[in-house]
Amino acid sequence: MDFTLSEEQQLIQSAAREFAQNEVAPIAAQFDASGEFPFETIRKAGELGFMGVEVPTEFGGAGLDAISYVLVMEEIAAADAAHSTIVSVNNSLYCAGILAYGSDEQRKRFVTPVASGQAIAAYGLTEPQSGSDAANMRTRAVLAPDGSHYVINGKKSWITSGPVADFMVLFAMTQPEKKSHGVTAFLIDCNQPGFIRGKSEPKLGIRASATCEIEFQDYRCPVENRMGAEGQGFSIAMSVLDSGRIGIAAQAVGIARAAYEASLQYARERRAFGSPIGSFQMIQQKLADMKCRLDAAHLLTMRAAWNKNQAKAKGLRNTLEGSVAKLFASETAMFCAHAAVQIHAGMGYSKELPVERYFRDAKITEIYEGTSEIQRMVIARQETGLR
């Protein structure tokens, strides 16, 4: 396992860092305050290949590997977590699933505009009453008598990019009696009748990534837009989340890195009792703990990405390594963001600096795409072979 970056990986890392620092960082506070969706910078991200890093060039993407995706996510997240959330959904949850389970025609129609940044995608799994509990999913898809389309009714909640999405991967129950084995995946055109965007969520962090509830009212989905076979949806969703968790781990590493770098600079410049506060042992201990956890989180995330590349070549899943990276990196982001606020003291509580935003943004990494509690359960089950 060699983490020496290839020339190609170094180039995309450099491009992502330049984009993040020059285009994203200067507007992050403004869009966090307003809660507006950053259409312009997301379009630019698409032009640079960041909205479809692992998508083949024939479908509008950059045609790179999982490590390249991790590098892009980390750089963008270090500038603004909200931007990286949008990038993550497009790459990990949407494009990855269609590339793995969709037909060539579905890839051309639904992946190409998203990977190129011309369209925005969403992922519809979570529901108001059951969260991501697929066995109790209430959204129903009923095949019409003539077999030409499905009629979909139900609600999805906490849909990232829902207010602005053009396309969605949706999971709905086609055979309720089979519980999780009765879930089917569909590709949804969000601009068709019966797709209703509900209330936007007033979130603690990642505020520029629009989030809302979606309702389906007699939405007609052509049968050719079903992805995979009937009843295959749950396995598709879990496989996609394996990949998505690596992206969230990279996002968490980016947030942690931003918090650490801000703390380093402040510790050097802020003076108290005649000395830089970085010379005080209590501050040094915090910085040392941040550095150790940050490096460990980064390496676990790189390992998960490397393993994903190997697993993909062999047609295997990458469940364990993705969950380990996501769990540790997300808790590292919270640890580093909390320490950064403490190091900055009163200024860490002020919106004049981005440190308080890092703190607010970090929390979601412990929640979405499987909470820390779920990750611990996944890891233990993978290791013991027990359920």
Residue ranges of each PLM-predicted region?
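Alpha-helical interface subdomain recognition
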Residues: 1-83, 89, 101-106, 113, ...
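A short, Trp-centered hydrophobic/proline-enriched beta-strand micro-motif
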Residues: 117-125
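Short Gly/Pro-enriched turn/cap motifs at secondary-structure boundaries
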Residues: 114, 129-132, 158-161, 175-177, ...
